[in-house]
Amino acid sequence: MSLSDEQVQAEMHKMVSFIKQEALEKAKEIHTLSEEEFQVEKAKIVREQCDAIDQTYDMKLKRASMAQKIAKSNVLNKSRLEILNSKQKVIDDIFSRVEKKLDGIEQKKDAYTKFMADLIVQAMELLGEPVGIVYSRQRDAEIVKAAIPKATEVLKSKNGSIDYELDAETDDFLNDSVLGGVVLVGLGGKIRVDNTLRARLEIVKEEALPEIRRLLFGENPNRKFDN
């Protein structure tokens, strides 16, 4: 039996209503899934951002710690350098005073003449030659002339079989910065012995420096070598 128009319309309305309901439920399902995916994605992004922030913080913390260590090390090194410079200034001042006391030593003529004779003898013994040219400061020229005979006499008393020849250089003089003393030259200038007060002071400075440091500043527990 065929349906009436009213029945057909009613069935159509039911179908439309069913389709709408299905569509609504599907839309709701899609919305729910989208919301869940959104929340999952959002949580993922938040977690990644938090991890990135943590990594950045750790990196900056490490850099800050390293910078602090470097700054501390620089300060310590600077302090040590300043202390070392201060100590060196004290030592330099001591030897500077010694140099000032040596200035004008030639004025004590008798004592200086004997001292110069001793220096010439020492230099000749180191030279190992019977013939030597004695170089000195110009201000010491007269004292050297007086000291050479004394030195020759001492040398002959030690080695009577050797004929020593000592001459003072009268044209080419040593610089006043040598503080005094002599330079002996032998074998036509091939051998040279520096027995000036400057050279002797440098030797004393090198040998006495560890003891001077101990006297001035005490023992250094960190120093392994005495130099």
Curated annotation (Swiss-Prot):
It is a peripheral membrane protein. V-ATPase is a heteromultimeric enzyme composed of a peripheral catalytic V1 complex (components A to H) attached to an integral membrane V0 proton pore complex (components: a, c, c', c'', d, e, f and VOA1). Subunit of the V1 complex of vacuolar(H+)-ATPase (V-ATPase), a multisubunit enzyme composed of a peripheral complex (V1) that hydrolyzes ATP and a membrane integral complex (V0) that translocates protons. V-ATPase is responsible for acidifying and maintaining the pH of intracellular compartments. InterPro entries: ATPase_E_C (IPR038495), ATPase_V1_Esu (IPR002842). Keywords: Hydrogen ion transport, Ion transport, Membrane, Transport, Vacuole. Coiled coil: none annotated. Belongs to the V-ATPase E subunit family. Its main location: membrane. One of its GO terms (cellular component) is vacuolar proton-transporting V-type ATPase, V1 domain. The keyword Transport applies. It comes from Schizosaccharomyces pombe (strain 972 / ATCC 24843). Gene3D superfamilies: 6.10.250.1620, ATP synthase, E subunit, C-terminal. The keyword Ion transport applies. One of its GO terms (molecular function) is ATP hydrolysis activity. GO terms for biological process: vacuolar acidification. This is V-type proton ATPase subunit E. It is found in: Vacuole membrane.
